[in-house]
Amino acid sequence: MVVTDSPVSGIMADQNIDPNTTTSPSPKEKHVSAIKAISGDEKAPSKEKKNYASKKSTTVIQKSHCFQNSWTFWFDNPSSKSNQVIWGSSLRSLYTFGTIEEFWSLYNNIHPPTKWVSGADLYCFKDKIEPKWEDPICANGGKWSMMFPKATLECNWLNTLLALVGEQFDQGDEICGAVLNFRARGDRISLWTKNAANEEAQLSIGKQWKELLGYNETIGFIVHEDAKTLDRDAKRRYTV
């Protein structure tokens, strides 16, 4: 795990994080199943492994389960936004992780959505991609967005993250990352993608995301270029 910048005060519930110590995840079956599927631990241990485990040993071998991609958490502090001269200058990279163990160590030490203030933004993007329209990989892309009440926000954010790091999207190479926006008018989760012109890929991502979260309402895809020029008047390019 790489600490890419000093953590912003207040975002982490415990900033003294040991990447080799993993806090137990939420006991929800779907989360446990997702992690087992990623790590390849679905099968029960063999008898041989059980025999080894039963022997007394002073040495503990810890096995890390690597993701296909490394990911970085970013944070945008609402108090800094009001003072920024250039858009995005208040963005701060927090931590970069590449294993299941590092992910849970970080996730379980981030304050839950109920403790966040309006105007804050949390990002989880593939490493080396900055969550900005100006980033070369994001520049020609767009985003799918869903609105959630506080009661279901944390669960849907976690499921979105697990789908991303677990490479559960057929068009996963098209995805840049996910954004969690805390707003007075409604909290929102968005998926940023690379190529808005690739209609087939965008529709596939939107449909799969809805299925993964069991989301029944229509969602829309906004092109970044349209959002830059038209702001809230930007029209949906695609809907599913």
Swiss-Prot record:
GO terms for cellular component: cytoplasm; nucleus. Residues 65-68, 75-111, 159-168 are annotated as: EIF4G-binding. Residues 17-26 have a biased composition (Polar residues). Disulfide bonds join C138-C176. PROSITE patterns: IF4E. According to the redox status, the Cys-138-Cys-176 disulfide bridge may have a role in regulating protein function by affecting its ability to bind capped mRNA. MRNA binds at residues 83-88, 115, 133-134, 183-188, 228-232. Its main location: nucleus. Keywords: Cytoplasm, Disulfide bond, Initiation factor, Nucleus, Protein biosynthesis, RNA-binding, Translation regulation. It is found in: Nucleus; Cytoplasm. Residues 39-51 have a biased composition (Basic and acidic residues). Residues 1-51 are annotated as: Disordered. SUPFAM superfamilies: eIF4e-like. Gene3D superfamilies: RNA Cap, Translation Initiation Factor Eif4e (3.30.760.10). One of its GO terms (biological process) is response to virus. GO terms for molecular function: RNA binding; translation initiation factor activity. Component of the protein complex eIF4F, which is involved in the recognition of the mRNA cap, ATP-dependent unwinding of 5'-terminal secondary structure and recruitment of mRNA to the ribosome. Recognizes and binds the 7-methylguanosine-containing mRNA cap during an early step in the initiation of protein synthesis and facilitates ribosome binding by inducing the unwinding of the mRNAs secondary structures. Belongs to the eukaryotic initiation factor 4E family. EIF4F is a multi-subunit complex, the composition of which varies with external and internal environmental conditions. It is composed of at least EIF4A, EIF4E and EIF4G. EIF4E is also known to interact with other partners. In higher plants two isoforms of EIF4F have been identified, named isoform EIF4F and isoform EIF(iso)4F. Isoform EIF4F has subunits p220 and p26, whereas isoform EIF(iso)4F has subunits p82 and p28. This is Eukaryotic translation initiation factor 4E-3. The lineage of its organism: Eukaryota, Viridiplantae, Streptophyta, Embryophyta, Tracheophyta.
